[in-house]
Design a protein with these regions (language model features):
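Transmembrane beta-barrel strands of outer-membrane/channel proteins
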Residues: 45-49, 71-79, 123-129, 177-183, ...
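Residues that define the transmembrane beta-barrel architecture of outer-membrane proteins
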Residues: 98-106, 148-156, 173, 197-203, ...
Length: 339
């Protein structure tokens, strides 16, 4: 999910063509260099893609409540073949864009022996490895340079897993509260357009729950909010621009999934996520107009409970509506092992 300011790209066409290639990216985020309105104000920062958009789905409100460790491995392949403007139309300066990214993320969670409000206190850490590969058609006026393979930004924070509600001998509801910080330790090259690291700190509170209306049917969701702090790390901006700081607008999103147990230990269902950015991005303290991102993805998925300690999730996400972002298909695999 690459954020993009098409207005900046189009305005950059009025200068030399090389300036179009100096578009700045946060983690998997397209920041097109150029001007907005009459202020000659380039977009310097966008919403990081180092967030959980569709990474979690079925049975999300559950995790272990007894002290111990769990390791979760995520594999996500994204094949993006369109770059959309603020109206959801293709940005015309990009001919046959193709941005492939492979994400291998390792999450380590530890449930402590401590209790709070009746729930189990735990700690999360997540570290991604990301490979980027971008290509464009021969007639593309603008193109983007990827930063190859490298480490992404680190996510860490505490969570509170509440004990499941039991009715008639079975769980009917479970919930979790969590707050994460994203630390900008990822690979970042100011001369590249696609980077693994976003270059700034973020704070992400979230709430996950699962409801079982019937023994076989579950509904899960995770509600998220992200606040992004200012960045003083200069991205790939036009030459001569005096950069002081940039800040991505805050955003909210929801991961939603529902599944049915078709045979014992195997569930099939649908999964989706919707994200909207509440405020425009800012450069040097000034708002850059029409830079808010909005995306809606949905698709099929399933989960296999292999045994008491191992589960495998699979999700396909297809674009339904995308604005100010790159668009394409995403495939997720998630493996959970509890020690």
């Amino acid at each position: 999910m690459f954020a993009v300011s098409y207005r900046s790209v189009l305005s950059g066409l009025s200068s030399r063509a090389s300036a179009l290639r100096r578009a700045a990216f946060g983690m998997l985020s397209l920041l097109a260099a150029g001007t907005a309105g009459a202020q000659n104000l380039p977009q310097s920062t966008t919403l990081t893609n180092g967030i959980n958009t569709g990474g979690t789905s079925y049975l999300d409100g559950f995790t272990r409540t007894t002290p111990g460790w769990a390791v979760i491995t995520y594999l996500r392949q994204s094949s993006l073949d369109a770059i959309k403007d603020s109206r959801g139309d293709d940005v015309p300066v990009f001919d046959r864009p193709r941005i492939d990214s492979t994400l291998l993320l390792t999450q380590v969670a530890y449930v402590t022996p401590y209790k709070l409000f009746g729930g189990a206190v735990g700690i999360n850490t997540l570290l991604p490895l990301i490979n980027l590969d971008a290509s464009f058609g021969r007639n593309s006026i603008a193109s983007l340079r990827d930063n190859g393979a490298g480490v992404g930004d680190l996510t860490f924070g505490p969570y509170l897993q509440m004990l499941p509600v039991i009715r008639n001998g079975r769980p009917v509801f479970s919930q979790r509260f969590e707050i994460d910080a994203i630390a900008p330790i990822g690979k970042f090259d100011r001369d590249r357009d696609l980077n693994q690291g976003a270059g700034y700190w973020s704070l992400v509170p979230q709430y996950a729950f699962t409801v079982f209306p019937t023994p076989n049917w579950e509904v899960s969701a995770r509600i998220n909010y992200i606040y992004n702090f200012r960045s003083e790390r200069r991205p790939n901006l036009p030459p001569g621009f005096e950069f002081r700081n940039g800040q991505a607008g805050d955003a909210g999103w929801i991961n939603f999934a529902t599944s049915w147990e078709v045979v014992p230990d195997i569930r099939l269902g649908v999964n989706a996520y919707y994200l909207t950015q509440f405020r425009d991005n800012r450069t040097n303290g000034q708002r850059v107009a029409d830079t808010r991102q909005s995306v809606f993805y949905a698709g099929p998925g399933g989960v296999w409970r292999m045994d008491a300690n191992n589960m495998l999730f699979a999700n396909l996400y297809l674009p339904v509506e995308v604005k100010n972002a790159a668009s394409g298909n995403n495939v997720n695999l998630q493996y959970v092992h509890v020690f």
